[in-house]
Amino acid sequence: MGLAFAGMLMASCTDSPTAVADYQVVPMPLEITAASQGSFLLKSGETICYTAGNEKMKKNAEFLAAFIKEQTGIALKVAEGDGEEGIVLRLGLEADSPEAYRLKVDERKVEISAPSEAGVFYGIQTLRKSVSVHEGAGAVELPAVEINDSPRFSYRGMMLDVGRHMFSMDEIKTYIDMLALHNINRFHWHLSEDQGWRIEIKKYPKLTEIGSKRSETVIGRNSGQYDGKPYGGFYTQEQAREIVAYAAERYITVIPEIDLPGHMQAALAAYPELGCTGGPYEVWRMWGISDNVLCAGNDKTIQFIKDVLAEIIDIFPSEYIHVGGDECPKVKWETCPKCQARIKALGIKGDSKHSKEEYLQSYVIQEAEKFLTENGRSMIGWDEILEGGLAPNATVMSWRGEAGGIEAARQQHNVIMTPNTYLYFDYYQAKDTDSEPLAIGGYLPMERVYSYEPMPSALSPEEQKFITGVQANLWTEYIPTMAQAQYMVLPRMAALCETQWSAPEKKQDYQGFLKRTARLTRIYQLKGWNYATHIFDVNVNIAPNTETGKLDVTASTIDDAPVYYTLDGTEPTTASSKYENGLTIDAACVLRMMAVRPEGNSRITRDSIAFSKSTAKPITMLQPINKPYEFKGATTLVDGMTGDRNYKTGRWIAFYKNDMEAVIDLKEATEISSMTLRTCVEKGDWTFDTRGITVEVSDDNKTFKKVASEAYPAMKETDANQIYTHTLTFDPVKTRYVKVTALSEQNIPAWHGGKGNPGFLFVDEIVLN
């Protein structure tokens, strides 16, 4: 994607010899107190003074000088001392958090003080972002101010998966620089996968000799076609130590992850004796989760885990070591004599909560946790480690929503919140997925990331104390380059960091946040980072007006840029209709909108709208919509718009454990003879087609008469994942109220991994004609 839009927000003062700083930064500081008058003039030749003999403070001073030079061209000197003029970095501030800082500006000096070197670094980041980018400025005026700031959470993380796709040393360092700009202090490095082992383990050299290389990679979403190109690579232990040191200079701790006992097919390709069948295995060429996992009944497995973790501990000084624990299929264990013997020897029995194989996984995780504890480290695992019993000192990373985190906090275990529906940055960030790079699915726009509140209201104040951090994740099945990785995380990382750092009361103004983020993108552009530009597009909202029977359209932009639109599907220009204060649609059309700016126009939005007799009519749901997929609620079914294969964009709503049952009020007796609805099927996600549809009519909304019904068989494994269109026709009938019932799958078939459970039913529109 192009970067043209960031330039449009460059302040006019960039052409002037003196620029003016602006303290409206991301993340928003806790307290900003502006003085009534006065300012400090930042110009070449000024000196940054730092605490004598403190190498970390010296490095901080050098960072600040480099940032200012890069962003403005102003050259600053660095010297030991505790001056009363110029720029002063000092320790000694008393604060509850070691990462707190105070930034104070007056006519004589700029002072950043903190309890620790890390706090000084965050003060430097705030100053850097306040100065922003003014290349060629002769000076920068810093208005007098006092900023007092500290982070909400002590753990502020961002993950990068290098198992599916690997990145060079320079690219990893760039990623760390991105984290530092956003006040993130934990780099979670996902180093092992079915598709590749990425870290040198000297006791097991085949892990990298064999396990780091796959013969080829599947094209797209497990299409069955492969690219025929060998893919591989790994980091030596010395390279990993270099990354640890680079991150530490920026006050970022690297947390390594070795995912076990699942996600281990690459390791099994190297050491097949560690698997239940003994192989042969290959480094996996496709995406998803392999059934081939470490054999929990093999004595060598526990020793392998301990040996690997011993070398990981030696490389990484982090307080936490991540052992994964997620998505471990148990099918091999169920038929493995060694695993079943281990279950018997341990006296494990299944119960109504967990199978005996799930309890066996808990045994493996607890062995890993015991080893880490004995070696002075703490363990993190994904929320699946709750299944079968939580290891005594484990920290839970809650990714499947918040339920795991809530359960762990109630058990008085530390929790890091990373729910996929808010913080998985491999999800699409735009509804128009055809114009986006291929992604894993989902829909996670900037606003949803920003809306996340990590403290569950279900927890008491005492229990909430165990929520110690927030993290976002970038899984890389469909992200082969750092440029694409940057596109997926920027600027969503800005929304993440404000959630991690800023107090909740500072997160009430999303539009203000967007304006601050637009300023931040100047630094992205200067650094050459390939950020997404969706925040500069037209924000279009289309809502049914059940009073008028029409659709009301509102449009806005981040900077009030003029918007032009067309209704016939053609590309808008400045000769097209100009959007003023709302738009009403009462007929089928293709609405396209564009923001016009001197520096470059926005991308063009596109919404296809169809009208039927049910469009913009009052609708009532008789059974509840599934909360995570409620979006705009029942009106989604009468808004004239249909969804695509991505059921998470807000164009679909879902039903789970109950059926879709809707009554549409046509407002007057109206003749109809057909009903069409569509379902979105993605069997791997437990989303299934309807098992039956009934159409009923009524004149009084009390007594209904059935006019059409159709039953559908349970889906077969070979049935396609796609959108299914169901049309029921019937003799013309004049009626006011129409009840449409679509039955959901209540018993997933035996061929599916979710057999016996209910499935999701996704519906996008009810069309009456």
What is the meaning of each model-derived region?
Residues G2-M8:
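Bacterial N-terminal signal peptides
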Residues T47, A95-Y320, E367, F371, ...:
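Feature activates predominantly on carbohydrate-active enzymes
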Residues R645-A708, Y712, Q722-N769:
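Aromatic, loop-rich ligand-recognition surfaces of beta-strand-rich domains
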Residues C13-S154, N375-W382, L386, L390, ...:
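Acidic, contiguous N-terminal accessory segments
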Residues M379-A394, R400-L551:
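Flexible, acidic glycine-rich loops studded with aromatic residues
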Residues G2, P27, Q508, L514-V663, ...:
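Short, compositionally stereotyped local motifs that mark structural "simplifiers"
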Residues R285, I289-P392, W399-E407:
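Active-site neighborhood of glycoside hydrolase catalytic domains
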Residues S116, A595-E599, S744-Q746:
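Surface-exposed loop/turn motifs at beta-strand-loop junctions within extracellular Ig-like
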